[in-house]
Regions:
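Anionic-ligand-binding alpha/beta catalytic cores of soluble enzymes and soluble regulatory domains
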Residues: 1-69, 74-77
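Flexible, D/E/H-enriched segments
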Residues: 29-30, 35, 110-115, 137
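A residue-level signal for beta-strand positions that form part of recognition/binding surfaces
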Residues: 52-54, 105, 135
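Surface-exposed interaction regions enriched in Ser/Thr/Asp/Glu
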Residues: 134-140
Length: 142
């Protein structure tokens, strides 16, 4: 283990060495004390409305992709959803960035199953001034 573990670099100081030990064949139970009472942080949730959901931006990654608090599993028909953010409307949630043109504002599923707002080959956050906690209105159409 590393001699100094800093509270802000767990990826470097804890997770990377742990992965290396596991890859080298060290058993998980030999790597340290079992934590029986982990602190679990609640994820923010989208609020149900008469026409869909009121969501918020909960994460903006280094590429400017903006994950919302709405899970894709909450959307009854991906093609019939309209998302409104930063004065823009996005029609439908598509399977991948490749379903739209370069520069288009798009809604896709992020790696955690949440609706993500992105710009194909660009930064939605930068292009539209999107910030954490910005509101996202999601409307379902029949």
């Amino acid at each position: 283990w590393l001699e100094n573990v800093y509270t802000t670099f767990h990826g470097r100081d804890i997770f990377a060495p742990s992965g290396a030990y596991l890859a080298a064949g060290v058993k998980l139970e030999d790597m340290g004390t079992i934590i029986t009472d982990p602190v679990r942080l609640p994820l923010p949730k989208a609020l149900k409305t008469e026409t869909g959901y009121q969501a918020n931006i909960m994460l903006i990654d280094v590429f400017g992709n903006c994950s919302t608090t709405l899970r894709v599993s909450q959307v009854p028909d991906l093609a019939k959803a309209t998302l409104k953010i930063a004065g823009q409307s996005i029609e439908g949630i598509v399977p991948s960035y490749g379903h739209r043109q370069i520069g288009d504002l798009v809604a896709v599923t992020d790696s955690e199953g949440f609706v993500e707002i992105a710009v194909v080959n660009g930064s939605a956050a930068r292009a539209y001034g999107i910030n954490l906690d910005d509101p996202v209105e999601v409307i379902f159409h029949d």
